[in-house]
Amino acid sequence: TGEWRVLADQLRAPVGAGYALENRLAMARMLGGLQTRLNIERHAPFFAAFRDGLAARCRRAEPRIVLLTPGRFTPSYAEQAHLAPYLGFPLAEGGDLAVLDDRVYLRTIAGLKRVDALWHRVDPRLIDPLAFDSHSGVGVPGLVDAMAADEVVVTNSPGAGMLEAPAFAAFLPRLCTRLTGANLLLANIATWWCGQGRGRNGVAGHLDNMLIAPAFGVATNVLADGVAVLGSDMPDAQRAALLADFERRPQDYVGREVVRLSTMPVVGENGLA
């Protein structure tokens, strides 16, 4: 029967919610009232909760929340341009914002308007040319100082992407239970970090049933391209090199459960496939 599982986490600039919304709206137009009659769960409550959650972190009762985009040349710009008006957020590029006395302002034809929160879709390394990459043309100079002064709320704050590392997936179930007293609502793929003796020994003893991946998303001595590989597909030489590197730098690796992904029929040029 199958079940839903989380394959990976996106925290730096999550993409996809806007595409789901666009797809739902397009399907609603095509199917007429069929979705309503089938009692399909609406997307609106999710976006309302997201918007209200951001607003709750702001000081003002009616905060101004801005979606910060890298600009129209980013691949997900269409999604951002669709999401912003749906949520009631101005869509702004770095040049549309200014930081004065550690406060963030939006440039408008009516003058500067205070910004209470930013939902940013910019690479964190480019978000503030004064704090990170000085060559960035898409960031907001002084934004990090405004964050440090607690004058603006930034969701997907710089550094959040660290939690995308596969190594953290090994601890999510226990962290969730410890912090919330409940299990994960949607289970992730079972993951074992080799930086712990028990995890390393378990992965080494079951290589043929594991997906071996870099623990922190970067190349390792054995996975030079930083891409995960099935243990069962490893040549003998690579397998020996991996086991040797487990002794030298076990913290660089994770073993992940191999899952069988679902498929669904599609209609193409040659009919149903």
Predicted stretch roles:
Residues 1-5, 9-273:
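Domain-scale recognition of functional cores that engage charged ligands
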